[in-house]
Amino acid sequence: MKPVKIITKAFSSFLWVGYVPVAPGTVGSLAGAVVWFVMPYKTIRVRLPVVLLFFLIGLVVAALEEKETNKKDPRNVVIDEVVGMWILFMLIGCMYFKDSIPKTATAFVLFRVFDVAKIPPMRVIEKIHGGLGVMLDDVVAAIYSAIVVNLVFFFL
């Protein structure tokens, strides 16, 4: 396998996490959450550029994987779930796992529900050609989840 393909597969599958046989999207989301909480530098000023960089990388590698597999949003591509989780955690203010276990767990479950259910306009967004459609539907799932989590924890 050529080095470019290896790099593409490594990024798109978040270091091969996307190749687990059962529920790769859920496992990818969980891997993203774990990495988020072990990342050093718990400030938005540091994290935001990392998230933006991974979003841009995701645009490219998701498009390349779609082209290679001839499938829309292949199961092994989980960088979109990872970036979606990271955006969600930024939007709900979760930087430290130990301080926000209920909020983190709620966010994770809601993100997976919204990502799987594809509540409008996610179906339309998912149909956008290439990596943009792959990445954006998870961004929308993150936004929907953040709205619900923030409302729930505001009123609790």
Language model features: what each stretch is:
Residues 36-49, 88-103, 150-156:
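Helix-coil boundary and interhelical linker segments in multi-pass alpha-helical membrane proteins
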Residues 2-27, 60-88, 112-143:
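Interhelical loop and helix-boundary elements at the membrane-water interface
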Residues 138-154:
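Final/C-terminal transmembrane alpha-helix of multipass membrane proteins
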Residues 29-33, 48-55, 101-112:
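Hydrophobic core segments of alpha-helical transmembrane domains in multi-pass membrane proteins
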Residues 38-40, 56, 61, 92-93, ...:
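Hydrophobic membrane-targeting signal helices
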Residues 44, 48-68, 153:
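Hydrophobic, well-ordered secondary-structure segments
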